[in-house]
Amino acid sequence: MKIILQYITLFAVVLCCFAACQNDEKESSRHMSKEKLIELNTILVRMDSMYITMYSDTMNLNSHPTPSGLWLTIHDEGNGDLIETGQTVDIAFKISNLKGKTYYTSETEGSRQIVVGKGDIEDGLNETLQMLRPHARATAILIPDKAFGLLGDNNKIRGRQILRYDIEILDVK
């Protein structure tokens, strides 16, 4: 798997260089056209999807993407109704990258209380919570724009990072 990831990374770098070096118009070499940026983003999204697919298969997660790009595996369905916007959820969690580096965990940070639907959490986490029931356990894989985007969290998580969230719903109010 490590070799495959190295080839994918090499392919992406070569493709980015190729896209950046082609200049049909007599514009400054520092400017990329909107079309080239869209093309580059499309390539990055495809590569993210391939990487997540390989990871999911390797880890036997049996995850599949939602239309928004969230990958979810529910390990324990929990009980009761689905969590709704406005409810306060207490979760145990572990946030890591797909290589296994742990960034945050409830063991060191304490459980996390979240008001579902509020804008102060990652979009992918908010979406995940609304697909779960009280006392559920799940693994969500968030593509960069569903997690911390291009900039990261300005602390431990770098930009454009695919993240794995292992979540257990402790309480819902």
Please report, for each region that a protein language model flagged, where it lies by residue.
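Sec-dependent signal peptide hydrophobic core
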Residues: 5-13
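Cross-family detector of peptidyl-prolyl cis-trans isomerase
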Residues: 3-6, 21-173
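C-terminal motif of bacterial Sec signal peptides marking the signal peptidase cleavage site
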Residues: 16-20
